[in-house]
């Protein structure tokens, strides 16, 4: 951190801008106050919620001026890290009951930098992932083309809804589905 803040002025400027964007949400006093535990509102015991089979809802929207995305990403990573610790400490060597991380609007709300590694390694530990993105391009823009392809490769079930206009992606999905032969039967009655 010292090097990033005291090095080349271009690097320092980039570092400061990145930090400001990540912490912009906390520049709003009411939001900052909600993130501080108090006697009336104690901190959530994440391990206890997971052990009881509870549910976490992280709700937010993308705002270019005060995005909740960095906070939601950090919190989602913390929840998943806690689940991993619990899975490794479990007498069964996995979470029982399992945990489903349902990541809707993944690129906008909580683009987890560790998602590919987690998908590859943590399914066997009782931590499953279901993620959704509006478009392939949105996923590639946030994660990069190679990382998005790696996520795509680790995905067991692919659901594509209508409305996609990405010709290349649609062709790729069509190629994955393969050729389908459909038998048709027709009858003629001999009349015109």
Put a short name on every predicted segment:
Residues 58-59, 102, 132-134, 160-162:
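Conserved beta-strand segments of the P-loop GTPase G domain that flank and frequently precede/overlap
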Residues 86-93, 131-134, 184-191:
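A generic structural motif
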């Amino acid at each position: 951190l010292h090097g990033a803040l005291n090095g080349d002025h271009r690097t320092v400027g980039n570092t400061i801008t990145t930090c400001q964007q990540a912490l912009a949400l906390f520049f709003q006093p009411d939001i900052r106050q909600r993130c501080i535990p108090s006697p009336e509102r104690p901190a959530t015991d994440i391990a206890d919620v997971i052990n009881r089979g509870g549910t976490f809802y992280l709700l937010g929207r993308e705002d270019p001026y005060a995005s909740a995305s960095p906070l939601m990403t950090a919190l989602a990573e913390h929840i998943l890290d806690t689940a991993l610790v619990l899975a490794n400490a479990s007498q069964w060597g996995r979470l029982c009951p399992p945990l489903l991380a349902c990541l809707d609007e993944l690129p906008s709300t909580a683009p987890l930098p560790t998602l590919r590694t987690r998908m590859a390694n943590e399914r066997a530990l009782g931590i499953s992932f279901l993620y959704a993105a509006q478009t392939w391009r949105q996923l590639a823009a946030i994660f990069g083309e190679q990382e998005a392809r790696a996520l795509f490769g680790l995905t067991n079930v692919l659901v594509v809804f209508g409305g996609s206009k990405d010709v290349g992606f649609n062709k790729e999905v069509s190629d994955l589905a393969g050729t389908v032969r459909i038998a048709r039967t027709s009858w003629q009655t001999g009349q015109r």
